[in-house]
C-alpha cells in the first residue's frame, strides 16, 4: 500500500480559516435570519478597476483570434508585465531589478510555500509569532519540523515573539538561523517596520549567511512616506532577501490569482560540498519544471494595473479599504478598545476586552453581534488575547459592524 506523507499528520486539526468557516456555518444554520457581517478572512469585495477589467476582456478576445491567440507563455512571466512592474513599482523606490530576477506566479500564498523546494531541510527557520499560518504549516508539511508542543510550537523552528512590548516587531534571534520570514506591513498585526529596523535584519542575515523571505503583499496600503515598500530599498538586501508580492489585495485579484517573486542574482546558498550556488538559478529551474506560467488574460489584466488610469483606479479602491480601516480603528477606540494597525495596513489588531481569550471573543462577536473576525491565537500562541479585523468589507457593512460592536461593548 502506498505510504502517506506523515508530516501532514503533525498539523493541528483544521487550518484557521476553515475552522472559522465551520463555526459560522453552524451559527447560520441555527440562526437563518441573522445578518452575519464578515470582517474575518481578508477577501476583497470591490470590483476590479474598470481599466483592468477592460484589459482582461481584451485578452480573452485575443484568444478568439488566430493572430492574437496565446498558448503556453514563458514560465517566468511575460516581459511586458515584468518590465511594467519594475518601471512603475520598483524604480520609483530607487530599486533597480533585472527582468531575470522577477518571476510572475498565480499567487504569493503558493510562492511562500513553493520557495521551500529549493532550500535544504536542515536549514534552521525563524518565524514571527503571531504569524500568517502558511509560513509555519508549509515547513511542517515539507518535513522540516518535529512535533508541536502543548503551546503549538514545532520542534526545529525558532519562534520570535511579536507583542506589545516590542511593538509587534520581532527581535533578532539569539541563535544562528538560516531562513527568516518577515512580513511588513504585517499580517495579522497591521504593523510596519522602518528602514532602520529592516537594516538590522539585513545586517544579521548577511553576517550569518541567512536568507530573508520578505512578504510585501500589503505594501500598496502604506500611507507613511517614511516606511519602505520593498526590502530592496535598504542597502545589502539584494544579497540576502527574496521578496514576495501579490495582486490579491493590491488590485483585488483574490479570485483572479497573480503574484510575483523577486530573487536577485546576488542571493546565494551553499551546496552540500560547501560551494556557492545561485538561488535565482534554482528558482528558475523549479519554475520551468513545475509551473507553466500564469494565464495570458491574467497577466494582461495585471499589466493594466500599472497604466496611468489603471493605477489611479486601483489606488481609489485601496483608499476605500483604508477608510474602512480608519472607521474600524476609530470606532473601537471610542469604546476603549486598544487597537494596533489599520494605518499602513488593512488589518486592525485589537486587544480583547476584559482579558477574554481570542476564541471566546470570536464566539461573543458571532453570537451577540453577528460579526465575524479572526482569533489572534489562530496565528500563534503570542496572538492569544488579540483579535484581527479586516477592512476589506463593503462600507455599509463595516459601519454597521462597528456600531454593533460598540453597542455591545459599552
UniProtKB/Swiss-Prot annotation:
Named cofactor requirement(s): pyridoxal 5'-phosphate
InterPro entries attached to this UniProt entry: Aminotransferase_I/II_large, DapL/ALD1, PyrdxlP-dep_Trfase, PyrdxlP-dep_Trfase_major, PyrdxlP-dep_Trfase_small
Catalytic activity: (2S,6S)-2,6-diaminopimelate + 2-oxoglutarate = (S)-2,3,4,5-tetrahydrodipicolinate + L-glutamate + H2O + H(+)
Leader sequence segment: none
A Pfam short name: Aminotran_1_2
Binding residue positions for substrate: 15, 42, 109, 132, 187, 292, 388
Documented EC number(s): 2.6.1.83
Disulphide-bridged cysteine pairs: none
A GO term, aspect molecular function: pyridoxal phosphate binding
GO biological process, alphabetically ordered: lysine biosynthetic process via diaminopimelate
Subunit structure: Homodimer.
Family: Belongs to the class-I pyridoxal-phosphate-dependent aminotransferase family. LL-diaminopimelate aminotransferase subfamily.
Name the UniProt record assigns to this protein: LL-diaminopimelate aminotransferase
Organism annotation: Trichlorobacter lovleyi (strain ATCC BAA-1151 / DSM 17278 / SZ) (Geobacter lovleyi)
This protein's encoding gene: dapL
